[in-house]
Curated annotation (Swiss-Prot):
The keyword DNA damage is annotated on this UniProt entry: yes
Name of the protein in its database record: DNA mismatch repair protein MutS
GO molecular function, one term: mismatched DNA binding
Gene responsible for this protein: mutS
Function field: This protein is involved in the repair of mismatches in DNA. It is possible that it carries out the mismatch recognition step. This protein has a weak ATPase activity.
One GO biological process term: mismatch repair
CDD domains: ABC_MutS1 (cd03284)
Length: 869
């Protein structure tokens, strides 16, 4: 680019170093953006796009935002997935000759936000790194705002996506190029993926991580954080090594289907298990609760420690209520400490910190009064009286937001500051006396002494009072003329102004220095404060468990040694809350080593899916250490929960409903153990009747022979109910419904035995389908029912051959049923179809839906619709 100004050369040089960012380039009171950055920012921020050098041949696109309100604009860009590099003026333009030095002081990315306004206080803001060495993968993640830092590794690539969707980072840093297929999977969590070419040789203190690959993952993450933030991040904790196998494993689809933290329909917290269980009083407790939901425990001792604490808190209602009041006065200590370390803390933040640590002695005294049922670590709560005293004697109770305008410190904290403030106060008293004296001397009652930053102090007289007034007679020198007034100064006023403003400026400057010193003193307490914050967050979670247990009549779960699951009067905790509690129908469930598969039949809308989900959710709550919605509950400890619930295409990867169903089933069949829980909701409905029936039976048999996992399997293939004759481990149950005077009444009660009717037409009537459709469907159904129904094959488990035997070609040929094909064709012939529709029917028969993506199916449907027009 020719004829570029020196300032624009400076911009282009800096921009070349931050090509993946929008560059906020400081010019005076604005951050300016140029070229493509300006086009992007103006579109997203909805601000005016202008041009620099508009009269030249190639004007430069340009837009800008005021520096004093830039944070809100940055927040908007970050929420849209952009990175923003903040380029500041490093010299005062007023005192600098030539070009002002500028440099990027920080890069704000989705995973490194430190501004409180840009974060949900109840959600962690994680940034994650991963690094691969052959089949081994190390993952490290950090919440820069709180300092939490963890690392793990595993040898199964499928676990990478599980960890990413569990951690749900806002940004991912990779050491190598990421394949498009992996990017698609990662997009379930974030679109912001940064590839770092090399890891810095700069040594960070990660000596506590001995494993080489995990050490590199932490190094990669810290290197990126320091590169973007360009300052010491002393609040980031030592990396905590953890094992993913130490927690119950649930993949993304299981968590989504069970609606643990986000509802499927609204994509919000409301209507989820997190929404139900969140009776926390602190932001730290709310974040900890989500972590506990995402990672239920698998060790009985740790679970029972939590349950013992919950029991104590339930039994002592008055103390729990007092504890909740104390916690309600505690602010977000974790993020306040992060802001102290980062350097963007203000005086109001420190007042919040003061109020928070003032509650620690109260919380400690209350918990010390409990018996030994509370976990031992809660005895480690530490009153930080020395820090409390420091903050109490230093800062005023209601300081201004800005730390550069003074008014922060109490009188008596610093002698020099007191002297400056006294000079300023005395000077203002003198100004008030001068104003009264001048009013009397001039006889102008409306005369006033005012101040602005341009002219300093001045005497103002309205134009109406200037008639016959001679300023020189009173020693007034004209300073400024306004439309309705004149402004004057006097020698005496000017002399006093220098004294007053000198004292004020010195006081403000000294206060800023004192605040910086105070911030450093508070920073020394970082590790102790973080420890207290962690303990308080755990206490908050446990009292939340106790609160919901007592409020909703939950019971303490027991854990069986023989892997028995026995739930009496179990309820879905969320469903019963969004409906009238008294209307909810509780149900039992018993599975053990001898009978570990429930085959569940019943009409649509009868509650089969709710019943299966509630068993899974109760298991999760129990292993979190919470009470559960049951009359009584005995459970095994599950290592994994697998779900296949609902019908949904995977539009991201172009997989059909049936393919998604099969992939989720594959995970359960491949990885489930005898300690796992499987929930299969109407497997096989995405394909033809015979294919679906065959696959459903084969899956049931596979679980029965291999993993022996506890399994809830709902189906509308009533032919499968005969499997209880060949599989002793399978029990038929059904969700009851009655038909009364042509109307279907759902009882929502799970009873022993099978049903042979799904009441599909009755459910269709409830949906108010046209009467003509209902009547026609009944005629066709009657015709179907006159023919033989397809029957499942005798279970291979009754035969001597192994499950893995592949059928011979002759076996498959022998199973062709031409009579059934003729019957199906005859059933369709019952419709009186016009000729054009017969052609479309023929076209439909050629389509193999199982091999189509959703987009291909929509295109084909559009093509057929056009033929009908």
């Amino acid at each position: 680019m020719t004829n570029v100004t020196p300032m624009m050369q400076q911009y282009l040089k800096i921009k070349s170093q931050y090509q993946d960012c929008l560059l906020f380039f400081r010019l005076g009171d604005f951050y300016e953006m140029f070229f493509e950055d300006a086009k992007e920012a103006s579109r997203v921020l909805e601000i005016t796009l202008t041009k620099r050098d508009a009269k030249k041949e190639n004007p430069i696109p340009m837009c800008g935002v005021p520096y004093h309100s830039a944070e809100s604009y940055i927040e908007t860009l970050i929420n849209e997935g952009y990175k923003v590099a903040i380029c500041e003026q490093m010299e005062d333009p007023k005192t600098t000759k030539g070009m002002v030095k500028r440099e990027v002081i920080r890069v704000v990315t989705p995973g490194t936000i430190m501004n409180q306004g840009g974060m949900d206080e109840k959600q962690n803001n994680y940034i994650l790194s991963f690094i691969k060495d052959g089949a081994t993968i190390a993952v490290s993640y950090c919440d820069v705002s709180t300092g939490e830092l963890k690392v793990t590794k595993f040898n199964d690539e499928s676990m990478l996506l599980n960890e990413i969707t569990t951690i749900n980072p806002n940004e991912i840093v990779a050491a190598d190029q990421v394949s498009e297929s992996l990017k698609q999977q990662m997009s379930l969590a974030t679109e912001t993926i940064t590839v770092v070419d090399e890891i810095s040789n700069e040594a960070y203190e990660v000596n506590q991580v001995e494993d080489t690959l995990m050490h590199q993952a932490v190094q990669l993450l810290l290197d990126y954080i320091h590169h973007t933030q360009k300052r010491n991040m002393n609040h980031i904790e030592d990396a905590q090594v953890y094992e993913a196998i130490d927690y119950m494993k649930m993949d993304y689809y299981a968590k989504r289907n069970l609606e643990l933290t986000e509802s499927i329909r609204l994509k919000s917290k409301k209507g989820t298990l997190l929404w139900l269980m969140d009776e926390t009083k602190t932001p730290m407790g709310a974040r900890r609760l989500k972590q506990w939901i995402d990672r239920p425990l698998i060790y009985k001792q740790a679970i029972n420690e939590r349950l013992d604490a919950v029991s104590q808190l339930i039994d002592r209602f008055i103390e729990r209520d007092t504890l909740r009041n104390y916690l309600n006065q505690v602010y977000d200590i974790e993020r306040l400490v992060g802001r102290v370390s980062y350097g963007n803390v203000n005086a109001r933040d420190l007042i919040q910190l003061k109020h928070s640590i003032a509650e620690i002695p109260n919380i400690k005294a209350l918990l010390d009064d409990f018996d030994d049922a509370l976990p031992e670590q809660f005895r480690q709560l530490e009153p930080l009286n020395d820090l409390l005293d420091l903050l109490e004697k230093s800062l005023v109770e209601e300081p201004p937001i800005s730390v550069k305008d003074g008014g922060l410190f109490k009188q008596g904290f610093n002698q020099q500051l007191d002297e400056y403030l006294e000079a300023s106060v005395n000077g203002k008293q003198w100004l008030a006396q001068l104003q009264a004296k001048e009013r009397e001397r001039t006889g102008i009652k409306s005369l006033k002494i005012s101040f602005n930053k341009v002219f300093g102090y001045f005497i103002e007289i309205t134009r109406a009072n200037l008639k016959g007034f001679e300023p020189a007679d009173f020693g007034y020198n004209r300073k400024q003329t306004l439309s309705n007034a004149e402004r004057f100064i006097t020698d005496e006023l000017k002399e006093k102004e220098d004294i007053i403003l000198g004292a004020e400026d010195k006081a403000v400057e000294l206060e800023y220095q004192l605040f910086a010193q105070l911030r450093e003193e508070v920073k020394a307490y970082t590790e102790r404060l973080q420890k207290q914050a962690k303990l308080i967050s755990e206490i908050d979670c446990l009292q939340s468990f106790a609160e919901i247990a007592q409020k909703y009549n939950y019971v303490r779960p027991e854990f069986s040694d023989d892997k028995t699951l026995d739930l009496v009067d179990s309820r879905h905790p969320v469903v019963e809350r969004v409906m009238d509690y008294n209307d909810y129908v509780p149900n039992d469930c018993r599975l053990d080593d001898d009978q570990f598969i429930y085959l569940i039949t019943g009409p649509n809308m009868s509650g089969k899916s709710t019943y299966m989900r509630q068993v899974a959710i109760i298991s999760i709550m129990a292993q979190m250490g919470a009470y559960v919605p049951c009359g009584s509950a005995v459970l095994p400890i599950f290592d994994q929960i697998f779900t296949r619930i609902g019908a949904a295409d995977d539009l991201v990867s172009g997989k059909s409903t049936f393919m998604v169903e099969m992939l989720e089933a594959q995970k359960a069949l491949t990885y489930a153990t005898e300690d796992s829980l499987i929930i299969f909701d109407e497997i096989g409905r995405g394909t033809s009747t015979f294919d679906g029936l065959a696959l459903a039976q084969a899956m049931i048999e596979y679980v029965a022979e291999t993993s022996h996992a506890k399994t809830l399997f709902s189906t509308h293939y009533h032919e499968l109910t005969t499997l209880d004759q060949s599989l002793e481990c399978l029990k038929n149950v059904h969700v009851a419904a009655n038909e009364y005077q042509g109307e279907l009444i759902f009882l929502h009660k799970v009873k022993d035995g099978a049903v042979d009717d799904s009441y599909g037409i009755q459910v269709a009537k409830l949906a108010d389908l046209p009467d003509r459709v209902i009547e026609r469907a009944q005629v066709i159904l009657d015709a179907f029912e006159e023919k033989d129904k397809p029957q499942p094959q005798i279970s291979h488990l009754q035969q001597t051959e192994s499950f893995v035997r592949e059928p011979e070609i002759e076996d498959i040929q022998d199973k062709k049923e031409p009579e059934t094909e003729q019957f199906q064709q005859g059933a369709f012939d019952l419709f009186e179809t016009p000729p054009v529709e017969s052609e479309i029917e023929a076209e439909l028969k050629k389509i193999n839906i199982s091999n189509m993506t959703p987009l291909q199916a929509l295109n084909k449907l559009s093509e057929l619709q056009n033929q009908l027009k």
